[in-house]
Amino acid sequence: MLDPSARLPFVTPLVLSNLAKEHGAETPDLSFEVNAPTSLKKAASSNGADTIQGAVDVLRALASMYANVGLMGANEAESNAVDAYLVQSDALATAPFQAAMQCADDLDQHLALRTYLVGFRVTAADAAIWGAIRSSSPLLGIIKKHAHAHLARWYAHVDALLAFSSAVTMMAEAKSNMFKNKK
């Protein structure tokens, strides 16, 4: 369940679902509801008992669900790094300017010689940090000023990937439908 009117990295679960779909994995049904908390119902559950709630917990569950396609990295060390970025993304989305600037500095330095945040292919870490940046006005401003060349390069690269761009399109359509239904 995703809220298309939410400000936080609401689009990231769609990206993870799209990445899994690109690798032939079966993905959960996604639904959109205004003012609904981000949640994921486990496949075997028809009642709410096995519902995961909260942005980070949903991202962790989706990344773990699709670990076989590499969303959690290639090994335990990468998996731990991905998890750290998932946690960081939650705080990053609402960080004030000074904290956002420090994080942008750290990410820029980390990405100096890398294409992806963890390992050699896109992971849940890339999706989570991209979603946090996308929902953060200070971070978008920092990237648009090109003061952090490596971070800007990485952001442009992942933003252009089909799984990411189609997630943005899906969420825009859900928002549009939400406003159409209000009339």
PLM regions: where:
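GST-like domain detector, emphasizing the conserved glutathione-binding G-site
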Residues: 1-117, 121, 134-137
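Extended, well-ordered alpha-helical scaffold segments
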Residues: 77-81, 100-103, 145-160
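Short acidic/histidine-centered micro-motifs embedded in hydrophobic/aromatic stretches
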Residues: 85-88, 130, 170-174
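A short hydrophobic/aromatic micro-motif that marks alpha-helical segments and, especially, helix-coil
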Residues: 93, 140-141, 176-177
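Polar helix-capping/helix-linker motif
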Residues: 113, 161-164
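GST superfamily/GST-like fold recognition
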Residues: 117-140, 147-156
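C-terminal helix/juxtamembrane-tail motif
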Residues: 163-183
